[in-house]
């Protein structure tokens, strides 16, 4: 085994002031491949070009991304939300579905501007989170779920039931476990009650829409009424939790970055959609706090270039995007959308491996929502900046939550701005 990083722990086990900095310090001391013993778990971290390529190439049946994701999310979410699901988040992005989501985004943007009025102040990430809730709930939570008090109740419930807390606030997971996930279970019950009402409206109107909500309803059609309603609601809940929070955070960062780069902002407002997508890619790349991890299910070999390590079952193999994305080549710590050509880095040959830098992941870790996410972020930034002149209140670039080790960064504190119709 590689050297152990003694004294290094992960934030769901021990107090860590900055989770990414802790792993960076271990890398500086021990090199690109090292082991961490945190709590009851063993981790093998790799950052070498060959090691990262080997990591992305691990067979799922031996070293599972799905199991690693589940083990992460269950720190926050009640176990019952995972049991017996029939329509899973991986089915979200069929081409005909995506067209409907973008239509719902347009409606959500119009509702958002109606709420904002002609002027005021807001927090960037509150705005994008609420927008993500509205678009998502309109797309898969049934009739009436994205309007009025029903929407507000669902948005509050999903803010409590945010699975991303497992990696955004991992230091809070001990308290979540100690409470037996009381708040999360109450929020899930609230979602179930509201979605059940939407199903009853659906049944009463004899709807036959084959969009995502219709497919969820159909999947539970043979079950007794109580099981059917709860099954539909839990499918909706897991889909929403798995799909929206990182997109909302990424949109927040591209708004922040464009406000800090007025020349690029002017071109986006003028209709340069290619630049808008490249800005979205670059902001997402720099905002990544993702720990990419695989839970080892059967013995597997990891080639790091110098040595091949035999990793036993029960270990986790991992790499960390915020370290790779900013250190694989000079200048990567800076925001520069011109480093992208369409969805790819323009100068991949400057990297020791193209696998070392990413906005949306590689291989099994690639986000299936990338095309949709880029279209959605482009539509949202174009709409919002086209309607409003925005003046940020922050004086230094917002920082991510220090304990976060996963997903797209959440801001560590308010990011307020003033806006006026322009």
Segment roles from a protein language model:
Residues 191, 219-270, 377:
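Central I-helix of cytochrome P450 enzymes
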Residues 319-348:
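Conserved cytochrome P450 K-helix/beta-meander segment immediately N-terminal to the heme-binding cysteine loop
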Residues 372-406:
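Cytochrome P450 heme-binding "Cys pocket" and the immediately downstream C-terminal segment
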Residues 1-72, 356:
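N-terminal membrane-proximal hinge/A-helix region immediately C-terminal to the signal-anchor transmembrane segment
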Residues 12-25, 271-309:
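Conserved cytochrome P450 K-helix E-x-x-R motif and the immediately C-terminal K′/meander segment
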Residues 38-41, 45-49, 67-109, 116-134, 146-152, ...:
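Cytochrome P450
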Residues 156-225:
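Cytochrome P450 catalytic core segment centered on helix I
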């Amino acid at each position: 085994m590689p050297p152990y990083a003694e004294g290094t722990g992960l934030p769901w086990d021990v107090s860590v002031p900055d989770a990414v900095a802790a792993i960076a310090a271990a890398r500086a001391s021990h090199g690109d491949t090292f082991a961490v013993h945190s709590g009851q778990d063993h981790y093998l971290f790799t950052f070498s070009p060959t090691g990262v390529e080997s990591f992305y190439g691990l067979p799922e049946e031996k070293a599972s991304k799905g199991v690693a994701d589940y083990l992460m999310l269950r720190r926050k979410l009640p176990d019952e939300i995972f049991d017996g699901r029939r329509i899973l988040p991986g089915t979200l992005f069929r081409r005909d579905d995506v067209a409907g989501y973008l239509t719902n985004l347009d409606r959500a943007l119009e509702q958002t501007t109606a709420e904002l009025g002609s002027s005021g102040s807001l927090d960037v990430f509150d705005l994008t989170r609420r927008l993500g809730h509205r678009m998502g709930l309109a797309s898969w939570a049934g009739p009436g779920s994205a309007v009025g008090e029903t929407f507000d109740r669902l948005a509050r419930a999903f803010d409590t039931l945010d699975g991303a807390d497992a990696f955004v606030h991992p230091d809070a997971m001990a308290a979540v476990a100690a409470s037996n996930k009381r708040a999360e279970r109450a929020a899930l019950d609230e979602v179930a009650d509201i979605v059940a009402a939407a199903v009853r409206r659906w049944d009463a109107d004899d709807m036959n829409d084959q969009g995502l909500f219709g497919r969820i309803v159909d999947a539970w059609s043979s079950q007794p009424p109580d099981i059917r309603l709860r099954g539909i609601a839990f499918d909706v809940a897991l889909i929403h939790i798995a799909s929206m929070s990182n997109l909302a955070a990424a949109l927040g960062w591209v708004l922040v970055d464009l406000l800090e780069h007025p020349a690029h902002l002017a071109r986006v407002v003028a209709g340069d959609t290619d630049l808008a997508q490249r800005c979205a890619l670059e902001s997402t790349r720099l905002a990544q706090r993702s720990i990419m991890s695989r839970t080892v299910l059967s013995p597997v070999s990891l080639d790091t270039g110098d040595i091949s390590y035999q990793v036993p079952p029960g270990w986790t193999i991992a790499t960390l995007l915020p370290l790779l994305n900013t250190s694989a080549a000079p200048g990567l710590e800076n925001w520069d959308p011109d480093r992208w050509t369409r969805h790819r880095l323009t100068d991949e040959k400057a990297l020791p491996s193209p696998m070392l830098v990413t906005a949306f992941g590689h291989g099994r870790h690639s986000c299936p929502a990338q095309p949709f996410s880029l279209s959605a972020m482009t539509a949202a930034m174009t709409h919002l900046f086209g309607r409003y002149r925005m003046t940020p209140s922050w004086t230094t670039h917002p920082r991510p939550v220090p304990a976060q080790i996963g997903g797209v960064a959440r801001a560590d504190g308010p990011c307020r701005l003033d806006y006026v119709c322009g």
